[in-house]
Amino acid sequence: LMKDYLDSKSLPLYDMLSYHLGIHGLDPGLTVPKRNLGILLQTAVKALGGNPSLTLPAAMSIEMLNAFCEIHDDVQSGNPTRNGQDSLWWVWGPAQAINAGDGMHSIARLSILNIDRNHFSDNTAHGAVSFLDQGALVTFEGRYRDLEMQERIDTTVEAYLDMAGQKTGSLYGSALSIAAKLSGHDEKVCEKIFQSGHFIGQARQIKLDITQIWGSESDQRIDFLNKKKLFPVVAVLENATPSQKRKLGDVYFKRVLEDSDLDSVLEVLDDLEGKKLATQQYVTAKNTAFSILKENLPDHSSEHLIDSLETILEE
């Protein structure tokens, strides 16, 4: 569906969108990135008794919104690569990348409004758009908090979890609540399911942070090099000695970080069991999200969704 839409446009702007999505211009040696949010939405529709063949525009919508966030994130972070190839801004420059990202956002809203009105009422369509916009706005709030934390060493676990739930979890909440709305569930259930995304986001972000620090790929460390506060660091700060806090401060207050600075951080994390603390919080967040789904959905529906989310979170 995304390919058909973008191929129907002649302006080179849409070639940029195709490039970012891996539809055209992808190195033959690379694989197209998984559309986790779109797949999750469709999986949820099926699990909740809806018809996935009718909700493809909504799946396209959530993927376009995610792409919008990715493009802007790459510009903000100065990330030169995305999914194994040069990032969009690295090829076309930040100004055109911002145009492309904003275009993705507009397409996301138009796509969900184009769902078949022979099967969905105006009220249902507008409700789905509302959950899309709600997810976008909360994501922006989380990204604001994330950037604000970069120059601070006194970030709390509570503040981090709020940020991660907003920044990373809101689109998962949107995907699930849109699926519930399009499957005929009432507003209260949809709102509860949206809230589960907050904890999915916490778990997902903590997992990514663990990979940033202990993963083997140096190109995965862009967030560390940009001084973003990763959860293991935030978790150990609460019990760190003054000398350990100074050691971390010496790293994070440097003008420019290098890969070698991670060694100093790892010493403190190893002493204070940072990886263990992060793993425990990951499990807590994941279980909280799953409990919300179990409490608000029939057993067969929640079990199917939880299996899908387990797969996404463990990637």
Q: What are these language model-derived features?
A:
Residues 1-67, 71, 75-90, 146-149, ...:
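Conserved N-terminal diphosphate/IPP-binding helix and adjacent helical/loop segment
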Residues 3-15, 28-35, 98-99, 118-214:
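All-alpha helical catalytic cores of prenyl diphosphate-utilizing isoprenoid enzymes
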Residues 28-35, 52-53, 165, 220-227, ...:
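Structural motif
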Residues 42, 59-61, 68, 101, ...:
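Small-residue hotspots
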Residues 52-54, 119-123, 187, 240-248, ...:
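Structural helix-adjacent loops and short alpha-helical linkers that scaffold large soluble proteins
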Residues 71-91, 104, 109, 113, ...:
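Acidic, Mg2+-coordinating active-site segments of isoprenoid diphosphate-utilizing enzymes
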Residues 126, 130, 191-194, 249, ...:
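Short, charged, amphipathic alpha-helical segments
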Residues 267-315:
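C-terminal charged capping/lid subdomain of soluble metabolic enzymes
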